[in-house]
Amino acid sequence: MISIKGRSVFGSIARGKLTFYHRDEFIINKIKVSDPELEYKKYVKAKNAALVELGELYDRARLSVGEGDAQIFVIHQMLITDEQYDSSIRTKILDEHFNADYAVASTSRSFAEMLAQMDSEYMQSRAADVKDVSNRLLRHILNCADKLPILRENAIICTGDLMPSETMLMDKAKIKGFCTRSGSVNSHTAILAKNLGIPAIVNVGTELSDEYEGKEAVLDGYSGTLYIEPDEHTLRQLEYKEAVEGRKKELLTRLKGRKNITRDGHEIKIYANILNSEELESAVKNDAGGIGLFRTEFMCFDRPAFPDEDFQFYTYRKALEAMDGKEVIIGTYDIGADKIPDCADMSAERNPSMGCRGIRFCLERESIFKTQLRALYRASVYGQLSILLPMVIDVSEILRVKELIVQVKAELIKEGRKFADNVKLGAMIETPAAVMTSDIIAKEADFFNIGTNDLEQFTFALDRQNPCYDRVSPKNHRALLRMIKMVCDNAHANGIKAGICGEIAGDPTLTEIFLELDVDMLSVVPSRILPLRKAVRSISLKDPKKAENDLKLFL
């Protein structure tokens, strides 16, 4: 028996035969052409054909996985028509006289490399989308057929990486699981596999060799392990694990509609962090009490310009309507650090993590910011909207935003547009400066969200991507817990609520501590909502002496 470890995408177990898929690699030659106009027409024809195909894929995906996941192919259409992407290809053909296939391949490679070098795993995973779009264009330019593997029954598809379009087009009835040598759990392919209910693991590395073609295997989507020719003992263990995990899922499902309340009556809100419409659907499906952070900056990628007011309005309206009266906290653009879209047109900074980001960026680009505020206030009539300002370090920033909101409201009234009068304005507390002045900020903010991801980095002077991060900066470090307590105390002293929307919010080993610190809300990825509810409902805080002693161990 051989076992290979990777990263789990979807928790389930699949048994089948390994089927290796190798997509044809294009042979691209760099050629100077004599008729660039003819070559450009070839590219335009390929682009138009690709857009039609993507429209068909969208329709197919919408029927099988829903509107949210089908948006993957809308994003691919947007990339093909992206002004910067299209302009680069056009320049290489018409001005530099290169062949169309080279122009597409070299431009796509540059875009993919740029994304792969970003710190954000989410943005790194978008490199696969660029490659998928590039392959689609090249197939049309070179007149190559789209070849998918001929699948046997009960196939576990093994490949280097899988493109979203390939995932969508394969015969799912014959597929038991996916296993890739590279890839990310945040890729569109991983999201599709998860929502199709297909067990998958990614990033297993080069140990996954073609020599295992046709071998019996079991894919453990819980631990992220592929077992090739497993022995009887391992099979029995995996069967038992599947039964146990299935029972756990069933019990978690029963928690839908229940309160997030401890055994002795302490209640805490559990909200969802989302980036896009797929995660919005997942938040609803997992019974989120609200949206704790909708990150709007991700709307700005793969675009020649910032989203216009109407696009934003419909996006925010959709989120508010989907949550059906529950609170939706929408963050204003958190541009900067590892999230710098091309449309931001920002000059290079020596240390972008500590540069013009968050609310600083918004206040420097007031016209862009006011467009976002207008869209938010227009959407506010469709639900319970709260607006969150990222990277606030001083109360003066909130005061300036309030001045802009007064201007925006006056404009909307003049235009005869409606907006809600109960929109809350909150501050993201994610720097030591904001923590230490949270008593002052609380006098102007309607609520606090503690962004522990950045707060940890700035407190410990250590990048979260650093390999020694977990060893040097434990999640229950006294400094971090003291900061959380200070923010909560200052919030409550001023009659407002304080929540946590960083990664540690979803850690059930810290849930009891957060309750003892008087945290009002935890906002997590949608898949963590029900496990966190289970953790809350198993806790009892009745003994104040014990709670005080527990806190002393940390504070």
Residue map of PLM features:
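Conserved, well-structured core domains of diverse proteins
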Residues: 1-142
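Acidic, glycine-rich flexible loop/linker segments
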Residues: 2-28, 139-142, 149-154, 158-285
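Alpha-helix initiation and N-capping motif
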Residues: 40, 47, 51, 69-73, ...
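Residues within alpha-helical segments
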Residues: 47, 51, 191-194, 284, ...
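Intrinsically disordered or highly flexible coil/loop and linker segments, enriched in small
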Residues: 52, 56-63, 67, 85, ...
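N-terminal-biased segments
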Residues: 113-151, 219-242, 441-473
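Residues on a specific face of well-ordered alpha-helices
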Residues: 135, 191, 314-317
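Conserved alpha/beta-domain cores
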Residues: 249-555
